[in-house]
A protein has these predicted regions:
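Conserved, well-ordered alpha-helix/loop/beta-strand core segments that scaffold catalytic motifs
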Residues: 194-238
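Hydrophobic alpha-helical transmembrane signal-anchor segments
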Residues: 1-27
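Short, small/polar residue-rich loop motifs at catalytic or cofactor-binding pockets
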Residues: 36, 41-45, 180, 234-238, ...
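Short, gly/Ser/Thr-rich active-site loops of penicillin-recognizing serine hydrolases
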Residues: 438-443, 537-569
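Short extracytoplasmic
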Residues: 35-63
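Small/polar-residue-rich segments within soluble enzyme cores
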Residues: 23, 78-85, 97-207, 521, ...
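Beta-lactam-recognizing serine transpeptidase/beta-lactamase-like catalytic domain environment
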Residues: 189-199, 245-285, 290-525, 562-569
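Short beta->alpha transition motifs characteristic of CBS
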Residues: 60-65, 157, 252-258
C-alpha cells in the first residue's frame, strides 16, 4: 500500500515538474518579464505661442519630477536626509512623504516636481534605492503678464496631466499639446534601469505652434496705459482693444488688473478671464453711432439735418436729459453726435423705428458672439424690439437698457472704419505643425452692414467729436485725423438693483481718411472722474499714438473743412 501511495505522489510531482518546465514556462517567464518592465510616458513638447513677429509669449520647457516607490526604500531617514539639500526641501517633509502604510502597497509617490534636468541628474547620481526620475511637461511665459488674459494659463487636469486652463491655451489645447511617446524599459527590484536590459521606445510628436495677430510692443503699451488709468482713476478694472479694421486682426487686448501665468495665486482668480470678451456692459453713448448709421443709411437724415433739442423729453414715463443742462438748442445731426445729445439721438431713432433700430444693432453684431471663438466669450444682451418698453425704446438708442462686450463695440467701429463692411475679429494668424508646415487661419468673407457712403459720412461726423467742438478734445492725436466717440454709461448695480457708478469709454480710429487702427478704452467704475472724454479719451490718445508710430502709419496731407454742428452760432 505504501509503495502504491509513494508511486502516486511521485507521479503527481513528476506531472507538476513537467508542467513547470514545459507547459507553463512561457507563462511564468512573461510574468517575470512584466514585473521587470516599466512603462514611462515621454511627454510631447507643447507648441509655442508667439506674437505676429515671432516673439515668444509661451514655450515648452523640459522639467523633471522625482518620485519614490516606498516599498523599495529601505532607509527612509537616510534617503530623506540625502535628498533634502538637493531638492531644497526639509528632511522631515520628505520623510513624511516616504512613510506609507505597508498594507496599502503604495508604489508611487511624488517627492518633487518642476525640477530642472540639472537637479534631476544630481538626484540620480545619489543612486538611492526606490527613487526614480521621470520627465514631465513644463510651460513658461517669458514676458510674464504680457497678454496673459489672451494667452491663458495651464492647470493639472485628470490624471495629473498638464492642460490648458484658460485663454488660447484652453481654446487650442488639442492643437498645442501634441502626442505623448512611450518607453518600455527593464528595471531591477529597486526600480533602477538595467543597462543591458531590453528597451522599446515610441517617440513623442510635438504639438503645433500658434502665431498670433498680437503685436508685442503695442500690447505692452496698451497694458501699461490701461493699468495706469485704472490706478489713477481708482477704477475696479479696465480694458483696451486695438484692431486693424481691414483684417479684423487684434493687435492688442489688454486688461487691468493682470496676472502672471508663471505663478498664479488665489488672489489672481478675478483676473484670470478676459474682460474684453467676457464682461458685458451697457455701452452708453458709443452706441449712438449705430442709431446714426441706421438713419443715414435709410436716407432719413444727412449730417446737416437740423434738429431742435429741448431741455428734456419724456418717453415711457421716464425723463430723458443730456449730460449738461441746457435750454432749447438747434444742432445739426452731426452736432447731435459731436455733443453726444441723448435727446437728439432719441428723436433720430424714432425716425428709424424700433424694428429698424433692432435690425441695425444686430447687423453690427450686437446680441451675438463675434466669431472669435475665445473661451467664455459673451454675446451681450439685446432684447427683441417687440419686448422693449416705451422708455427702453428710447434709451437703447444711446446705449442703455442693453449690453455688449468691449470686443463687440470695437468691432462696430471697425465696421465703420472699413467702409461699412464687418469682418470677424482674429487672434490666431497661423498654425505651424510639427512638420513645419504653416497653415494661415482663413478669414471668413466680410459682410456689408451699411453703404460705403454712409460709413464715409459717419466718419466725418465722428471726426468732430475729437475736437474742441466735441466731447473729446483730449483724444486728438497730433498730426492725424481721429474719428471716435465718447461713452459715459450708468453702471448696473448687481447687488441692490438700479445703477451705481459709471463705465466711461472712448472708441475711435485713425487716420480718419484711411483707417488703419481702431482703439477702444473702457474703465469700470472709476472713483476719480467718470466722463468718457475726461478719463478714457487721454488713454485712447496714448495707445493710438503709439500704435500709429509703431506701425509707421503716414500722416494725412490735407484736412477737410469742419462740419456745421451748431445752428445757433
Amino acid at each position: 500500500m505504501s509503495i502504491v501511495l509513494m508511486c502516486a505522489v511521485l507521479s503527481v510531482l513528476g506531472l507538476r515538474l513537467t508542467q513547470l518546465q514545459g507547459f507553463s514556462a512561457s507563462t511564468y517567464a512573461a510574468q517575470a518579464e512584466a514585473q521587470r518592465l516599466r512603462t514611462i510616458v515621454l511627454p510631447a513638447a507643447r507648441g509655442a505661442i508667439t506674437d505676429r513677429a515671432g516673439h515668444t509669449l509661451a514655450q515648452y520647457v523640459e522639467l523633471r519630477a522625482v518620485y519614490a516607490n516606498p516599498t523599495n526604500v529601505r532607509d527612509i531617514a537616510g534617503t530623506a536626509a540625502k535628498l533634502a539639500p538637493v531638492l531644497d526641501d526639509s528632511t522631515e517633509a520628505l520623510r513624511r512623504r516616504l512613510t506609507t502604510d505597508p498594507a496599502e502597497h503604495i508604489k508611487f509617490v511624488y517627492l518633487a516636481r518642476g525640477l530642472t534636468p540639472d537637479v534631476a541628474e544630481k538626484v540620480s547620481a545619489l543612486g538611492l534605492r526606490g527613487i526614480g526620475i521621470t520627465e514631465e511637461r513644463g510651460r513658461t511665459y517669458p514676458s510674464r503678464e504680457l497678454a496673459a488674459n489672451v494667452i491663458g494659463f495651464m492647470r493639472h487636469g485628470d490624471g495629473d496631466i498638464l492642460e490648458g486652463g484658460g485663454g488660447l491655451e484652453l481654446a487650442y489645447d488639442e492643437v498645442l499639446r501634441g502626442t505623448d511617446g512611450l518607453r518600455r524599459l527593464e528595471a531591477n527590484p529597486a526600480g533602477i534601469e538595467i543597462p543591458s536590459g531590453q528597451s522599446r521606445e515610441k517617440d513623442p510628436i510635438p504639438g503645433s505652434s500658434l502665431r498670433l495677430t498680437l503685436e508685442r510692443d503695442i500690447q505692452w503699451n496698451a497694458q501699461n496705459a490701461i493699468a495706469d488709468a485704472v490706478r489713477t482713476s481708482e477704477a475696479d478694472g479696465g480694458t483696451a482693444v486695438v484692431m486693424d479694421p481691414r483684417t479684423g486682426d487684434i493687435l492688442a487686448m489688454a486688461d487691468a488688473p493682470q496676472f502672471d501665468p508663471n505663478n498664479i495665486t488665489a488672489r489672481d482668480t478675478p483676473a484670470l478671464g478676459n474682460r474684453s470678451t467676457r464682461d458685458a456692459y451697457e455701452p452708453g453713448s458709443v452706441n449712438k453711432v449705430i442709431t446714426m448709421a441706421a438713419a443715414l443709411d435709410r436716407g432719413l437724415i444727412t449730417s446737416e439735418t437740423p434738429m431742435t433739442i429741448p431741455p428734456f423729453i419724456t418717453r415711457g414715463g421716464v425723463r430723458i436729459e443730456d449730460s449738461e443742462p441746457h435750454g432749447v438748442e438747434h444742432l445739426t445731426a452731426a452736432g447731435v453726435l459731436a455733443r453726444s445729445s441723448n435727446i437728439g439721438t432719441v428723436e433720430i431713432s424714432e425716425r428709424v423705428g424700433r424694428i429698424g433700430l433692432e435690425q441695425a444693432l444686430r447687423s453690427f453684431g450686437l446680441g451675438a458672439r463675434t466669431g472669435l471663438n475665445f473661451p467664455g466669450e459673451g454675446a451681450g444682451l439685446l432684447p427683441a424690439a417687440r419686448d422693449w418698453s416705451g422708455s427702453q425704446a428710447a434709451t437703447i438708442s444711446y446705449g442703455q437698457g442693453m449690453s455688449a462686450t468691449a470686443l463687440q463695440m470695437a468691432s462696430v467701429y471697425a465696421t465703420i472704419a472699413n467702409g461699412g463692411v464687418r469682418v470677424t475679429p482674429r487672434l490666431v494668424d497661423a498654425i505651424t505643425g510639427p512638420d513645419g508646415v504653416v497653415k494661415v487661419t482663413p478669414q471668413p468673407p466680410g459682410q456689408r452692414v451699411v453703404s460705403a457712403q454712409t460709413a464715409a459720412t459717419l466718419t466725418r461726423m465722428l471726426e468732430a467729436v475729437a475736437t474742441n467742438e466735441g466731447t473729446a478734445p483730449l483724444a486728438e492725436v497730433p498730426g492725424y485725423r481721429v474719428a471716435g466717440k465718447t461713452g459715459t454709461a450708468k453702471r448696473p448695480d448687481p447687488v441692490h438693483g438700479g445703477y451705481q457708478g459709471y463705465v466711461p469709454s472712448f472708441i475711435g480710429f485713425a487716420p480718419a481718411d484711411d483707417p488703419r487702427v481702431v482703439v477702444e478704452i473702457v474703465l469700470d467704475n472709476p472713483k476719480k472722474g467718470y466722463f468718457g472724454g475726461q478719463v478714457a479719451a487721454p488713454v485712447f490718445q496714448r495707445v493710438m499714438s503709439f500704435a500709429l508710430t509703431t506701425l509707421g502709419v503716414p500722416q494725412p496731407i490735407t484736412r477737410p473743412a469742419p462740419l456745421l454742428l451748431d445752428l445757433d452760432r
